[in-house]
Amino acid sequence: MRRLPRSVQLVCVLGLLAGPAQAQDGDLDQFRAHFDQAMSALAAEDTTGYTKALEQAYPFLPARHLNRPFVQYHLARAYAMTGDSLSAARWLSQMLHDRIEGLMLYYTAYDGAFDPVRSSKSFKDVMRQVDTLDVTATHLQGNVYLLEGAGCQIAAQVGPDGVLLVDAGYSLAAPAVLRALGGITKAPIRYVINTHYHEDHVGGNATLGAAAAVMAHPKTREALLEPQTFIEGVVVPPHTGHSLPTLLVENPVSIEFNGETVHVFPLPGHTEGDLVVRFEGSDVLHMGDRYFALASPYIWPGKQVDAYVATMDSLLATLTPDTKVIAGHGPVTPAASLNASYQATLELIDFVRMAVSAAKTVEQTRAMGKARGFPEPWVAGIYEALTEE
């Protein structure tokens, strides 16, 4: 069984909890300390300690931090374990209200922690709120629209050939995605491109890709054929049927659709099978979860650092000052913001590379990096990647 690493469970926590820019209205060190206590209590089956530590951790996260819904989910399940349906429903409702990634409540269907409250009126009322979910459609430029509210940022390229989607959101959001598209066009969906295998990006495949070609990296299809662990004890069954990609992309490819060239680049790092999509004529780039806009000053390069640098150099060379960059989560940014994050990442990579060349240990490199203001988890991760290449 393939398990999501801790970094994925916390929405790429390595990137989001590093650096001073994220802590302007919160204290992430305090958050980490209390959250680790909560996980230790959970492992010890101490429900009271689990709940208390989560309540202590939550206020230290900034208001729009991408990890807030993850902590809200844990708080809901902690109260559900004690049979407190009102408190569990309150935290699930807060997830939906915040609209960061409220549809993470999808996982409650597979989480036995919610069994004590599943039949309660308050829990059912929250789940019914999903039926009224709105996905908004905003025209970006050219043929491309941004669909928000489905669990991830979806790009929709629309024209006479039909609709091409980049990512599909959670399955719970698929009806709302179709309603949003219906306000733009009556054309059918012809392509769905999955940037990677995580449920918030592929859950809508079965509905949105029912009459379309679903494109993804072979590693994404491999992952979808296996059960996926969200958190300990919460396992999503394998995908089947229309949920599975049928067009597999292992090398850069281009397709002509709606009068423009659409380039698809493999860029592993967040997972083993990440894809990014460049709409040449519309001048839009969708980075999936390879870029968390404004959440971190860096971009995680992954284990294949040299391949990452080569691909990013080629990709950035195609961008213009007017390029709009869609991240898997967070705001649309100009190309300059993506480039700034990339240049900061190159500086970090070069620092670690020099330390490795000088035969420094990982502990020495972490200490040197800390003195330079580099986040220690990033230094250690890049050190490991470079020494394994």
Predicted segment positions?
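Conserved beta-strand hairpin/beta-sheet module of binuclear metal-dependent hydrolase folds
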Residues: T138-A180, V277-F279, D283-D289
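Metallo-beta-lactamase
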Residues: G162-V163, G169-L172, S254, T261-F351
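Active-site HxH/HxHxD metal-binding segment of metal-dependent hydrolases
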Residues: R179-S254
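Accessory terminal helices/loops
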Residues: M81, G112, P116-D131, L316-K324, ...
